[in-house]
Amino acid sequence: MSRFVDKLPLFDRRPSPMEEAEGLPRSGYLGQLHHHQYYQPHSNMLPLEQSPPTSTKHTSVTLAQLLKRVNDARSGSSTPISSPRYTIELGGSKPESVSSESDDHHSDDGGSEGQPRALVLKFTDLTYSVKQRRKGSCLPFRRAAADEPELPAMRTLLDGISGEARDGEIMAVLGASGSGKSTLIDALANRIAKESLHGSVTINGESIDSNLLKVISAYVRQEDLLYPMLTVEETLMFAAEFRLPRSLPTREKKKRVKELIDQLGLKRAANTIIGDEGHRGVSGGERRRVSIGVDIIHNPIMLFLDEPTSGLDSTSAFMVVTVLKAIAQSGSVVVMSIHQPSYRILGLLDRLLFLSRGKTVYYGPPSELPPFFLDFGKPIPDNENPTEFALDLIKEMETETEGTKRLAEHNAAWQLKHHGEGRGYGGKPGMSLKEAISASISRGKLVSGATDGTMSVAASDHSAPPPSSSSVSKFVNPFWIEMGVLTRRAFINTKRTPEVFIIRLAAVLVTGFILATIFWRLDESPKGVQERLGFFAIAMSTMYYTCSDALPVFLSERYIFLRETAYNAYRRSSYVLSHTIVGFPSLVVLSFAFALTTFFSVGLAGGVNGFFYFVAIVLASFWAGSGFATFLSGVVTHVMLGFPVVLSTLAYFLLFSGFFINRDRIPRYWLWFHYISLVKYPYEAVMQNEFGDPTRCFVRGVQMFDNTPLAALPAAVKVRVLQSMSASLGVNIGTGTCITTGPDFLKQQAITDFGKWECLWITVAWGFLFRILFYISLLLGSRNKRR
């Protein structure tokens, strides 16, 4: 633990007097919290210093130019930086250059009143309600029981929540399950539709565009959504390639990743895979820190986290919050939800917001918890964690009829009495939003998209409006770079999970072997013709059933995709194309494997040309089948829902393909299903490839009696029957006379709509269509906002 905290640049590692008195190790412990002294910041944890800004001209400076100037300054250039520079002192003593205003940066009240802050996130009267349905209300015939209580039509998840978060501090949202913690984090992170959320969220007093917020912020979900087969370093490097501008050299991106690995305490695990249930990887705490690192790779100005310590032991949770404290002190606004912080974690938090049934029941620094509850008539006992006491009391008050309301009213009265109406805990913004972004760039914040030159920051123009959505580039990299990075990442994942391809190849080879041995060397008799029909129907449908394993591929990546695209890491079109490129080589291998196993063994016609056409139609079938499964994976949300849909739909496709019933016999009201059947076109294609030659004869002379009651007659009798037929019809029909050619058989099967090449291209077109539909499903179904 001490080695981990020692690496963090924002903490002086000399033990505090309390640590020395109690003989505690140098573990970053911020002191035991006692009654009326629950929050005592580390004495050597220094605030950010604001040096006097250099003179600037009244001209707009792009973020790209600011970033370039910062890089020049770091490399020793004399280029001036036209924004305030914030520095962090690492020593134990306070340097003389730190202004007296900084001394109160971590005062008990959370900061001195009126002290200018670079960034202040303020939220006022946030209210959010959702429709509430009774269980089973979707059934039209269900009526509520007489004794069933009437439920309100709307359920309020947030009820007039107000507060503010500042750079350099951590604001923690606490409450029991269902109190509205995650909902509030989503509201602040712009993950709730504007038409559903009431109230205002501003930064430095200015409303912010959603596209700009995506650029300067990051959101860390409660779940660890990572690729299990990538190492820690690879995961962060891919995040850097997605979030950092392409004008930044690769060596600088690698340097940023190395620094972040050190900051997160992941140096020993850098070359370890993330892991999952079947592959051993990093620990739970390390995985959580990697999740945070992925979203802070571009050093965001604002960081929102949904229960980052959930599921971790106390040591791992403390390490995670310590990292967040370092991020906050680097000049970021950090807002997180947390269930129940320990003593040590509480010492790292600057501001608490307790929720109960969507209402604010306490808002302020940890140091004010004891007097707050003392004034409420519920003093916190000595040596008890104040947050545990508060959460237990809030839970107890929720069982009372007006308990939550009384506590919320007490909080409102407390705020009015101690902080005044409309008066926060200090930290008034000392600059406009544009100036704040400019200052963040000068501190080394690599704002995503900053080098596109599309978003300008007028550091000296106080009257200029904040950047609009039209001036903010949505994506850092161009389309082809995104596709290249996504393709490379997918190939690495595929290479490290060879068992997935091996299982598919084994399934194809086993199926081909079984078909080859059953339909070995078919002859050109009527019986051989019927056996060919069965082989083609089973073979073509096998292609589609084999592709059903593509369904869980995207479903396993679904939430990773949602996390990455929520902040415009890449375009959805880039993902679809890279997904297609990575999957295509395996389809080629599977097609050749199946064709080599069956074509010559069954004795199909066409020679070399026929073989390569057979390979092409098998490949087209794999292409269309994988596209169909991919499309469904974008529509359904769970693999247990997807497989029944895939299997049942493919069964219908086979039923209407023309094998079981000819097109001429299908009822007219079902004929449309025949034409959308994916099996129809490859089935008819291989049939025409086999029976399209008019010189091949499949029924000669007495063979016409095969598969009829006359088949059991002696050969001599069959010959006499042929002679009688010849005399009656006036046509000479001998034992060698060709009765049915290949084209004749195709007409009998009603395979006359399309030629074999048309069937091939239609099958290929189905594959493209399903991938386009997959892209549309990602556009419509991958929204990251609540309604």
UniProtKB/Swiss-Prot annotation:
Residues 74-85 have a biased composition (Polar residues). Residues 1-25, 71-116 are annotated as: Disordered. It comes from the Eukaryota. It is a multi-pass membrane protein. Residues 484-691 form the ABC transmembrane type-2 domain. Residues 121-382 form the ABC transporter domain. The chain crosses the membrane at residues 500-520, 535-555, 576-596, 599-619, 620-640, 641-661, 728-745, 760-780. PANTHER family: ABC TRANSPORTER G FAMILY MEMBER 16, ABC TRANSPORTER G FAMILY MEMBER 28. Belongs to the ABC transporter superfamily. ABCG family. Eye pigment precursor importer (TC 3.A.1.204) subfamily. This is ABC transporter G family member 5. It comes from Oryza sativa subsp. indica (Rice).
